[in-house]
């Protein structure tokens, strides 16, 4: 048996899933101040339905990190940046306790300017004097040479053993220094609280006598184990939309181009699935005003949902807030849901209430009730479609760096719209009809998020950079560095083998080796390096991943 | 404030040959640098996706012999198309200025193209300018070519166009390819003084070039009042460039760009792929986006290493004064030329294509018009790289041509169809945007 729990901003959904069917569902309001309690309440309500059967796996998404970042309740953390020469320092407005130090490495990993020991000593002394117990360090091009980050790390360990440190080269091997610095900082400032939370969850699971695997959902639509999560807690942000998207994918046909439209109370989340694969945000998850190296789905949120209330002020307005439930569910004001209910004669809830409240607003606007519904339905459909199409354009207009990519210019051809959330049944078929594609709705659509959490598999992406003339390679995440055995004639195939081997090692270490055989390469680049007029070697960049997908036990839902 | 548009197209799958300076690796470290800096994430920058230019966009400017398709591959269309994307973004008000960091380059490509010269097949900036004129009705254009090599292709294309001010500073042609761009090259009889060349001595530094910008180029732009300013942003004046001998720095380039404030910049040459390009491109992006670049420098930069010599400064000052006079007197000179010339001015020209070892012979005929810059006819012959020989006749009616030049140009085309002494006839009527090729032996006319 599998349990999936999606902790959302308003509600927490949980499902108990067995052999293609949902055995039990639970929905509870989320208590932001005590996520652990909410989680455990949902878990405890699901457990009796399992009876004596073993729970193999529990996966949950959580808003813990999102809340920590939004409220600034993370641990006070100093960020030491080595930005070298380039943008002015005020471009790196990441946190209050920020320190800039000298020390420069270039894109080939050559040291241009060494660390200034005295300057670093001064900075560390100031950090210690301020009572700060956690430090993040980020150097430009540390992904190509981490020597300066390591030096600062060693210095801290020797001089200030009570201060913990995170270095950017261990967080990510990707280019983009500001994103790497922000990701390292956010990791450092949330890790303490996260570990406390993880320990509590572990304890609670043990107390209940369960020996299930416990996984956390990540922004990239995959999971990692509770143990692994404490290395990179930031990856748990935005796991709610990831749960919905993966849930939509789990319920529908794979290999299609789909829009997943998750219609909530006052917001709708739009995600794209291209040939069965969810689309990622090209610049990584955005936390506050900072882009990061956290892999996250591209999700477009529209301030519009089933409970969005309707008003008249010279024209019909669909507001971006709610004044309570829809009239058909006992609310006092007409909502988007009520308008669809009447227009399409859906008979949801108390349809008479929908009609009555809409009639009151129509009278105020001096129009027929049917005209009011027509206008509201139009506004909603048009707003959703324009947001969906904006996402298509954005995807089509991603920068391209090869002739091949421009000549074979991509165009998004939509096959279906997958509806998720309680209000989806009313709205999604209308949007799909207007776009002349199929709509896909499933009985499990309202709990697709929790289902998604229950059945997704772990993910892992490994990036390898090799510079043969410099006899150097680096692997991320984890900040592995080394020199090559045979630098002379290395070819792309060998670099790919090397990347695959590191992926395999990491899979073993994280207890996910059963998925290693499903890895695929998502980046293969090689460049000849010319010195003078002859070739001196090659640079390779290889990326290999276990992409988002489903655990082998999951064979679809019985309809 | 509107953002700066950037189109970064490194063509990671295109090279002239594996070890050629124009190889896949050329913008690799530039990519590393600008990605690592994260500058593309800033709200001051908007990044764009390339597109393919259309065959017509190329044929509006060039006579590609025998056809556009025969002279180029897709990489060229992407590079030229990228410049057009930037032109659209600028003209439609999406960005305050735009920088196309693209390859293959273009500024050595001339009106007639039999092959590749100076790493260039088609002229990206000029294709963009004719597109701007056609689509947006732009009339007056200024091009400032800051590549270390003389922009001889762009100069030839606009030699007779009084509405295009072409200014090129470069390392003296006696010491560097393509061996042209001397002070006396001031434009054709009806466009005299709108081509301005500043041949600089090897080792000229930031100070020397910035003096020319402040004292000559900026006043000229102020006076000429172009509708748009284009920068052919070559980066090989840099002190580390392996193909040239100048002493310009990344910060100097940023400063130059900031003072020049071009509407659209287009990358040209620059072959110090590791020690200059990453920093010069950063500097240019920062300058265009109005980001403080005082913290930018190359790893080995030492400001005291390059001091302008008083002697060279004197030379530059003299040159600036002389070119200013030539520019100021241009209207008188042109009026004088109109009086003393007949109906047509005819001249011969030999063009060498260094990349492909092609020798082209041209006879040019310019109509001396009382109202406009005149239309031009070019008779061209060459053995192309394939061994094939072409003898062609091309008629180009410029975008700002008067009624009479349009009529006479079109009549000349019809006349040539009757006379038939060539393999191919070309009509390029940029006013009507009517582009035709006539295959004489087969009697087939293709309207593009």
For the regions a protein language model found, what residue spans apply to each?
Chain A
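N-terminally biased helix-coil "hinge/interface" segments that flank
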Residues: 1-559
């Amino acid at each position: 048996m599998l349990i999936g729990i999606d902790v959302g901003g308003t509600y927490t959904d949980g499902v108990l899933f067995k052999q293609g069917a949902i055995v039990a569902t639970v929905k509870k309001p989320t208590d932001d101040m005590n996520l652990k309690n909410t989680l455990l309440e949902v878990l405890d309500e699901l457990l009796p339905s399992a009876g004596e059967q073993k729970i193999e796996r529990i996966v949950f998404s959580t808003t813990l990190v999102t809340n920590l970042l939004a409220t600034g309740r993370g641990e006070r953390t100093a960020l030491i940046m080595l930005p070298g020469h380039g943008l002015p320092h005020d471009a790196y407005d990441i946190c209050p306790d920020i320190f800039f130090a000298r020390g420069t490495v270039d894109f080939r990993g050559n040291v241009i300017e060494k660390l200034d020991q005295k300057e670093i000593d001064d900075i560390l002394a100031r950090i210690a004097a301020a009572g700060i117990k956690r430090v993040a360090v980020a150097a430009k091009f540390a992904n190509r040479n981490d020597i300066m980050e390591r030096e600062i790390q060693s210095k801290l360990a020797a001089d200030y053993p009570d201060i913990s440190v995170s270095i950017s080269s261990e967080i990510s091997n990707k280019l983009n220094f500001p994103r790497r610095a922000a990701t390292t900082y956010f990791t450092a400032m949330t890790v303490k609280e996260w570990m406390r939370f993880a320990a509590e969850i572990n304890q609670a699971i043990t107390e209940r006598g369960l020996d299930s695997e416990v996984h956390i959902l990540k922004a990239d639509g995959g999971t990692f184990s509770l143990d692994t999560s404490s290395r990179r807690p930031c990856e748990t942000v935005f796991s709610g939309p990831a749960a919905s998207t993966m849930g939509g994918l789990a319920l529908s046909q794979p290999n299609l181009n789909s829009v997943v439209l998750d219609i909530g109370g006052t917001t709708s989340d739009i995600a794209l699935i291209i040939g069965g694969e969810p689309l990622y945000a090209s610049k990584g998850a955005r936390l506050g005003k900072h882009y990061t190296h956290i892999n996250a789905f591209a999700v477009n949120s529209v301030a519009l949902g089933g409970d969005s209330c309707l008003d008249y002020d010279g024209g019909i307005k669909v507001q971006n807030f709610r004044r309570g439930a829809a009239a058909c569910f006992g609310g006092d004001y007409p909502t988007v849901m009520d308008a669809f209910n009447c227009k399409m004669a859906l008979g949801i809830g108390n349809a008479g209430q929908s009609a009555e409240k809409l009639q009151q607003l129509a009278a105020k606007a001096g129009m027929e009730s049917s005209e009011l519904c027509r206008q509201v339905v139009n506004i909603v459909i048009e707003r959703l479609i324009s947001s969906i199409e904006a996402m298509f354009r954005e995807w089509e207009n991603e920068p391209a760096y090869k002739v091949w990519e421009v000549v074979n210019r991509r165009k998004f051809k939509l096959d279906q719209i997958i509806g998720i959330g309680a209000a989806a049944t009313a709205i999604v078929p209308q949007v799909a009809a207007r776009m002349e594609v199929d709509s896909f709705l499933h009985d499990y659509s309202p709990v697709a998020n929790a289902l998604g959490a229950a059945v997704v598999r772990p993910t892992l992406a490994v990036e390898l950079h090799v510079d043969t003339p410099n006899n150097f390679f680096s692997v991320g995440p984890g900040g592995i560095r080394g020199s090559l055995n045979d630098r002379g004639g290395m070819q792309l195939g060998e670099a790919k083998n090397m990347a695959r081997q590191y992926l395999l090692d990491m899979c073993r270490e994280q207890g996910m080796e059963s998925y290693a055989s499903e890895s695929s390469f998502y980046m293969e680049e090689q460049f000849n390096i010319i010195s003078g007029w002859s070739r001196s070697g090659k640079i390779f960049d290889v990326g290999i991943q276990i992409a988002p997908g489903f655990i082998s036990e999951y064979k679809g839902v019985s309809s | 404030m509107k953002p700066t548009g950037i189109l970064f197209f490194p063509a990671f799958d295109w090279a002239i040959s594996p070890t050629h300076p124009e190889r896949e690796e050329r913008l690799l470290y530039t990519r590393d640098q600008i990605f690592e800096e994260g500058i593309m994430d800033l709200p001051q920058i908007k990044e764009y996706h390339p597109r393919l230019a259309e065959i017509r966009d190329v044929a509006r400017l060039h006579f590609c012999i025998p056809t556009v398709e025969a002279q180029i591959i897709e990489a060229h269309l992407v590079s030229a198309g990228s410049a057009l994307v930037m032109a659209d973004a600028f003209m439609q008000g999406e960005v305050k200025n735009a920088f196309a960091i693209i390859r293959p380059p273009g500024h050595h490509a001339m009106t007639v193209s039999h092959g590749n010269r100076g790493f260039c097949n088609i002229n990206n900036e000029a294709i963009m300018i004719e597109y701007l004129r056609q689509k947006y009705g732009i009339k007056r254009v200024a091009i400032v070519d800051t590549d270390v090599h003389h922009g001889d292709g762009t100069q030839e294309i606009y030699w007779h166009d009084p509405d295009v001010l072409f200014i090129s500073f470069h390392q003296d042609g006696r010491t560097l390819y393509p061996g042209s761009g001397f002070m006396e090259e001031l434009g054709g009889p009806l466009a005299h003084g709108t081509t301005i060349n500043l041949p600089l001595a090897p080792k000229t530094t930031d100070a020397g070039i910035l003096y020319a910008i402040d004292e000559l180029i900026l006043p000229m732009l102020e006076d000429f009042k172009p509708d748009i300013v284009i920068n052919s942003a070559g980066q090989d004046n840099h002190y580390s460039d392996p193909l040239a001998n100048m002493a310009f720095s990344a910060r100097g380039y940023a400063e130059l760009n900031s003072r020049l404030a071009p509407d659209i910049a287009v990358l040209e040459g620059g072959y110090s792929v590791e020690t200059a390009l990453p920093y010069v491109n950063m500097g240019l992006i920062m300058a265009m986006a109005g980001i403080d670049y005082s913290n930018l420098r190359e790893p080995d930069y030492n400001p005291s290493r390059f001091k302008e010599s008083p002697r060279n400064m004197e030379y530059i000052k003299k040159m600036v004064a002389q070119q200013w006079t030539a520019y100021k007197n241009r209207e008188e000179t042109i009026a004088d030329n109109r009086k003393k010339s007949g109906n047509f001015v005819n001249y011969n020209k030999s063009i060498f294509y260094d990349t492909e070892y092609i020798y082209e012979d041209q006879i040019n005929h310019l109509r001396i018009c009382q109202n406009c810059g005149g239309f031009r006819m070019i008779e061209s012959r060459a053995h192309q790289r394939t061994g094939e020989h072409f003898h062609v006749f091309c008629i180009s009616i410029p975008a700002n041509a008067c009624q009479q030049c349009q009529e006479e140009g079109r009549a000349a085309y019809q006349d040539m169809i009757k006379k038939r002494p060539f393999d191919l006839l070309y009509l390029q009527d940029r006013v009507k945007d009517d582009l035709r090729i006539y295959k004489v032996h087969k009697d087939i006319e293709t309207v593009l």
